[in-house]
Amino acid sequence: MSRVAKAPVVIPAGVEVKLNGQVISIKGKNGELTRTVHSAVEVKQEENTLTFAPREGAVDGWAQAGTTRALLNSMVIGVTEGFTKKLQLVGVGYRAAVKGNVVNLALGFSHPVDHELPAGITAECPTQTEIVLKGADKQVIGQVAADLRAYRRPEPYKGKGVRYADEVVRTKEAKKK
């Protein structure tokens, strides 16, 4: 059995936590995040910590408590430090540019691809072949990065496409005659 739920989440200075039944909202310098806690989990706030325990009669109580603890810890980190995700464009003529809240991609199609960013997410391009996504919500950052990657996934022969900065693309050997 995992013991993730037994560790409390420490609330740093400058972070405000509001518990309203099963709805919890965490506010910090990077914004405010809200989440509904699973009904099998009981969250208690004591001074500067959040503790988790399963409710009576919940079959999957400890599992849900561990998941809730991990999600709320990510929310606390998000509103204090924020999350970043880096993408690289590999290929001849593959370029990215940011105009406001729209990422403009040239990925070898006959048309440019415009991807609108959701609220709370910012993007910047240090170079034409790099995209850096920043925001407070870890799940939304990952989803936007996955959406951008889905436009042109790295292909296995030359490795061309949109990839995560830390991704290792396994390449195949070309067919031999």
UniProtKB/Swiss-Prot annotation:
<comment type="similarity">
    <text>Belongs to the universal ribosomal protein uL6 family.</text>
</comment>
<comment type="function">
    <text>This protein binds to the 23S rRNA, and is important in its secondary structure. It is located near the subunit interface in the base of the L7/L12 stalk, and near the tRNA binding site of the peptidyltransferase center.</text>
</comment>
<dbReference type="GO" id="GO:0002181">
    <property type="term" value="P:cytoplasmic translation"/>
</dbReference>
<dbReference type="InterPro" id="IPR002358">
    <property type="entry name" value="Ribosomal_uL6_CS"/>
</dbReference>
<comment type="subunit">
    <text>Part of the 50S ribosomal subunit.</text>
</comment>
<dbReference type="Pfam" id="PF00347">
    <property type="entry name" value="Ribosomal_L6"/>
</dbReference>
<dbReference type="GO" id="GO:0003735">
    <property type="term" value="F:structural constituent of ribosome"/>
</dbReference>
<dbReference type="InterPro" id="IPR019906">
    <property type="entry name" value="Ribosomal_uL6_bac-type"/>
</dbReference>
<keyword id="KW-0689">Ribosomal protein</keyword>
<dbReference type="InterPro" id="IPR020040">
    <property type="entry name" value="Ribosomal_uL6_a/b-dom"/>
</dbReference>
<dbReference type="InterPro" id="IPR000702">
    <property type="entry name" value="Ribosomal_uL6-like"/>
</dbReference>
<dbReference type="GO" id="GO:0022625">
    <property type="term" value="C:cytosolic large ribosomal subunit"/>
</dbReference>
<protein>
    <recommendedName>
        <fullName>Large ribosomal subunit protein uL6</fullName>
    </recommendedName>
</protein>
<keyword id="KW-0694">RNA-binding</keyword>
<dbReference type="GO" id="GO:0019843">
    <property type="term" value="F:rRNA binding"/>
</dbReference>
<dbReference type="InterPro" id="IPR036789">
    <property type="entry name" value="Ribosomal_uL6-like_a/b-dom_sf"/>
</dbReference>
<keyword id="KW-0699">rRNA-binding</keyword>
<keyword id="KW-0687">Ribonucleoprotein</keyword>
